[in-house]
Structures are given as C-alpha cells and as structure tokens.
C-alpha cells in the first residue's frame, strides 16, 4: 500500500479517535468505543484478537463552590475526587512537619508551599512512588481533614507543565475530597485561617470497565515481537499526539500485515491505562504474561509520534547487536526517522523491567510536547502530521519482515 493511501487513512482514523470520539479517558464511553473500533479493525485484517477487561472508574464533575463569609474563591475539583458539602474552619499547612503537628479532623485543610510544589503520585501507583509523596499521603489519611484545598503554582517537571494551576491529586484511590486553586487564590484564602468556610464539590465516581486489545499473528507466538501503543487519553485532552498517533500507527501496520504468514510471532497491543492513575491495562498485561517475557524477542512502544514539528525519534534498550543493527539499518532508509535520546517514562518500561530488548519511538521534540501540549486541550489533530504516521507504519512493517527472516 502506498504511503499516500496510508496517510489518508491515518487522517480518517485521527478524526475518528479525537473528534467523533470526544474523550478516551479510561472508563468513559469514548474509551470503550475506541477499543471496540480498534479491535474490530485489526480483526478485519486477519489477526486473532482478545480483549481482557479490568474494573476501573469513570468520573463526572459539575464544579466547585468555595466561600468564606461573603468572599468567594475559584477552585477546581481534583480529578477523581469524591464529592462533598462541608462547612468547617480553615486550617493551613505548608510543610510536612507542620502537618504532622496539627489536629485537622474537624477542618478543611489548605495545603500550600512545599507541600504543593509538585503533583503527588497516586497512592497505589505500582511503578514509581517517592517516599516524600508517600509520607504526605500517609499524614493526610492519618490526620483525616474533612476536605483538602491545594494551592499550586507551576510544576515545570510535570508533563503538561504549562497547566496552571495543576491538580495536586489525581487519584481515584485517595478518598479525602479535594480541590485545587492558583497560588494567588491560596494567598487570598490563607488570610481567613481559622474562620468557618463552606466547600461544595459536585463530583461523582462511576464504576466502569475498560479493556486492552491484543491482536496476534505468526506461526510461533512463543518467539514474538510485541508492539505497544496506549489507546487512552488524559482527561480533558483530545489526545491526538498522545496517543492517537501511536494507536493509528498500529492500525496502519496491522493492515500492512494482512497477508503476513511468517514464523515470527507478532503481537499488537492497544494498552489501556497509561494516562490513568493506576495503569490498569499495564498491570493486567504484566500479570497475564508473568513468566513469559522471555518469549519476547523485542518490545516496541509507540507514543507521541505524529508531532508536525521535527522528526520521529527512536531509542534502543538492551538490544542484542544483531537486532540493533537490523533496527538501525531499517530506520536509516526513512529520512524522517532519527536515533534520539533515551527516555524511560513510557510503556516500554514494562519490557525493560523484565530484562527484554526494547525499542521506543516518539517525537524528536518530545520535551517541547511535554512542556506545553501533552495532557492539555492543545493536543489536537491539527498538530499531527499523518504522513509521519504512514512512514512509521511502513518502517515497522519492514523491520518486522527483516526480523522474521532472521527468525526463519
């Protein structure tokens, strides 16, 4: 299939995943529609498919009211927060040491300063959780304030660092209702410390389900290449580059492999949950493949690959010399592919942690994306170049066929 034809299909898939489906957040109807669309399409290309499911929550919110006497304050519900209606005195803490010395079970607690300099990792996040974050969460749950207000500034290290204010909590396992506000609003509010205040969070957690989509071909699945792209999107973001782009590359690749009859196993996985607080799809895949990662010849992760600026960058992790040579030789034939810097925040970490060779593919300008576009409303279809998605699908097809020749 010609690159031009693939580009046209890529544009139509982009419209489907980002416009016709308004949200792909885990647990939403849009997320379920996206995985159903992916599963049906890859099955039509002759792949055997399965869709292992997991329980999760969707979330709905209808705003926040926060007032002290006649003064009102702008605040936003923390993603996945429980709702509440509270009237209680305002307490304030700026450090863990201050919090440890306080009794706040009767109060609404305003967090500011050092306690809110960076977003706290979800309490049950399995792959990374620093002790400093765990200490803050443990203190909050022990002290048990009736609700929490977080005054945050800018976290330049956070993905989507241009978002201001940022939510201190994004955690459906943390059950103290919470909101967040700007540093300036926090400075206004702190002058009312000790006074009674009213807070209403109109929000609801909704039990739901999501699922991964796993598509397989090849005579020998016990020796296979696994290709990941996470299909979910961050709440509030169209998720065009992150990661409709990677999902579309897998769909184009599946069509290019419609007639594949090789020995090497090929496993295409639309992983569901990379942008969700507990990574349920990743955890489900790890559990299902426990003791079987030795079968993986190469793990490939495709994320944020379609940005219209710059080229597409690849990086290698613990690849045998022969596999690395094949990757570099294949990529060198495509002018929009360049070898880039290593990065470890994506789903290729599942292969690395299981000591398997990995290939990560993303934008050459990933830092630019993460600094102001990724996880934000700016991640729209207009920033994605469909020709890059077509090129990458063709390059991956060539790579898989060469790896199959080596396996035969």
What are these regions (language model features)?
Residues 1-4, 20-29, 92, 121-131, ...:
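Second-shell loop/turn segments in exported
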Residues 2-29, 45, 52-53, 155, ...:
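N-terminal capping segment at the start of a domain
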Residues 2-8, 12-120:
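Noncatalytic luminal/extracellular "stalk/propeptide" segments of secretory-pathway proteins
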Residues 68-101, 161-240, 252-259, 263-265, ...:
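Soluble metallo-hydrolase cores and metallopeptidase-like ectodomains found primarily
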Residues 75-170, 175:
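Extracellular/luminal Protease-associated
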Residues 108-111, 147-151, 178-180, 214, ...:
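Structural recognition of the beta-strand scaffold that forms the well-ordered cores
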Residues 147, 168-171, 308-408:
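Active-site-adjacent substrate-binding region
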Residues 156, 166, 175, 209-212, ...:
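Acidic/histidine-rich catalytic neighborhood of metal-dependent amide-processing enzymes
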